[in-house]
């Protein structure tokens, strides 16, 4: 089912007329940065619990970070929100910001966990390669180990590095 994609400015007009804006990103992404009018309903929660019945007769605009998550899950979102009139925000919150519309940013919140994993994994791989060339070839094993961990995470859905980073003090929420 093809859902209508709308521009940020069109979405803002619909919101002003009572449409509900639903952010399907994870809580850590939302807490760091979100559109002020958006309500958080992560895709994983929507899949389990569905949409509240009171919203099923509203206009609903779903959004994510860049629009990919909403477009990839358009059929699921349509089924979850039926019979509501459903729209997808073009380019997600990134498009909203590019259009010059306001976002609420909380820099005291940590970066989203997956970004932390990408930074840590990329840094460890780079360190392993640089040290492997300059100090001792044994350091290449570090890069191989991190690469194997990422491969395992992709296949199994379990990311040990994400679990470890989630336990770090800066990721502990009060």
From Swiss-Prot:
Cytoplasmic side: 1-115, 159-174
Activity control, per UniProt: Sulfur transfer activity is inhibited by S-nitrosylation of the active site residue Cys-64. S-nitrosylation competes with S-sulfhydration and causes small, widespread structural and dynamical alterations.
Reaction(s) catalysed by this chain's protein: thiosulfate + hydrogen cyanide = thiocyanate + sulfite + 2 H(+)
Transmembrane is among the record's keywords: yes
Residues forming the catalytic site: 64
InterPro entries given in the database record: Rhodanese-like_dom, Rhodanese-like_dom_sf, YgaP-like_TM
Keywords: Cell inner membrane, Cell membrane, Membrane, Transferase, Transmembrane, Transmembrane helix
Localization: Cell inner membrane
GO cellular component terms attached to this protein's record: plasma membrane
Database matches in CDD domains: RHOD_YgaP
Induction / repression: Part of the ygaVP operon, which is repressed by YgaV. The operon can be induced by tributylin (TBT), a toxic chemical used as a biocide and in textiles and wood preservation.
Molecular function GO labels: thiosulfate-cyanide sulfurtransferase activity
Transmembrane segments: 116-140, 144-158
Effect in UniProt of substituting residue 64 to D: Unable to bind sulfur. Cannot be S-nitrosylated
Keyword Transmembrane (UniProt): yes
Membrane topology summary: Multi-pass membrane protein
EC number(s) given by UniProt: 2.8.1.1
Occurrences of domain Rhodanese (ranges): 15-105
Topological region Periplasmic: 141-143
Intrachain disulfide bonds: none
Function in brief: Transferase that catalyzes the transfer of sulfur from thiosulfate to cyanide to form thiocyanate. May have a role in the detoxification of cyanide to the less toxic thiocyanate. May also be involved, directly or indirectly, in the transport of the thiocyanate produced across the membrane from the cytoplasm to the periplasm.
Subunit-structure text: Homodimer.
Domain description: The catalytic reaction induces conformational changes within the rhodanese domain, as well as in the transmembrane alpha-helices.
Designated name of the protein: Thiosulfate sulfurtransferase YgaP
Lineage: Bacteria, Pseudomonadati, Pseudomonadota, Gammaproteobacteria, Enterobacterales
């Amino acid at each position: 089912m093809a859902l209508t994609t709308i521009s940020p400015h069109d979405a803002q007009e619909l919101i002003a007329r009572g449409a509900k804006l639903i952010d399907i990103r994870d809580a850590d992404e939302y807490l760091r940065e979100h559109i002020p009018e958006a309500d958080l309903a992560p895709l994983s929660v929507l899949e389990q619990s569905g949409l509240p019945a009171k919203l099923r007769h509203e206009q609903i605009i779903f959004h994510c970070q860049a629009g990919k998550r909403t477009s990839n899950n358009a059929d699921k979102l349509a089924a979850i929100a039926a019979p509501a009139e459903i729209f997808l925000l073009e380019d997600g919150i990134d498009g909203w910001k590019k259009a010059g519309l306001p976002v609420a940013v909380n820099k005291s919140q940590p970066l989203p966990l997956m970004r932390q994993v990408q930074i840590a994994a990329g840094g460890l791989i780079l360190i392993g390669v640089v040290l492997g060339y300059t100090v001792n070839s044994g350091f290449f094993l570090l890069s191989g180990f991190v690469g194997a961990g990422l491969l395992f995470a992709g296949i199994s859905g379990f990311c040990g590095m994400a679990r470890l980073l989630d336990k770090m003090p800066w990721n502990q929420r009060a």
